[in-house]
């Protein structure tokens, strides 16, 4: 069986989410999450993420990918502060996810993916 070559995936951050991008850059944020849509289902352990916020870019390798059916199961494994440093509570984190247009429905349909970053 032929070994899969690691791939590169581009993840974009809106300018209003620059703080999140900065947390990743500084190493404070080690888990990035995305709704488990087809686009993100392709990301696997060993792949490289190019994280873009405006003209700023950085690369992180994916150490582990985990798919969760619900936010509740996500928070059983990862605390909200691991996903977004300083967010505080699970309730605040859920409110943040639901603030993104269409995200609540995407999570209900596709679940949510957690990418552990090196």
Region locations from a protein language model:
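Compositionally biased, charged N-terminal/linker segments
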Residues: 1-43
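Ordered hydrophobic segments in well-structured contexts
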Residues: 10-12, 59, 112-116
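Catalytic phosphate/metal-binding cores of nucleic-acid and nucleotide-processing enzymes, i.e., regions
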Residues: 22, 35, 39-40, 59-61, ...
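A generic structural signal for residues embedded in beta-strands
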Residues: 32, 51-52
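Short beta-strand-centered aromatic/proline hotspots
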Residues: 57-67
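Short, solvent-exposed beta-strand-terminating loops
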Residues: 68-75
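Contiguous surface segments at macromolecular interaction interfaces
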Residues: 75-118
């Amino acid at each position: 069986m032929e070994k899969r070559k690691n791939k590169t995936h581009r993840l974009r951050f809106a300018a209003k989410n620059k703080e999140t991008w900065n947390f990743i850059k500084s190493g404070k944020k080690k888990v990035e999450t995305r709704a488990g849509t087809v686009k993100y289902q392709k990301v696997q352990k060993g792949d490289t993420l190019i994280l873009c916020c405006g003209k700023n870019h950085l690369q992180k390798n994916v150490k582990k990918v985990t798919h969760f059916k619900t936010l509740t199961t996500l928070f059983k494994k990862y605390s909200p502060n691991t996903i977004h440093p300083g967010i505080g509570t699970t309730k605040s984190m859920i409110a943040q996810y639901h603030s993104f247009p269409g995200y609540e429905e995407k999570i209900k349909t596709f679940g949510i993916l957690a990418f552990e970053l090196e």
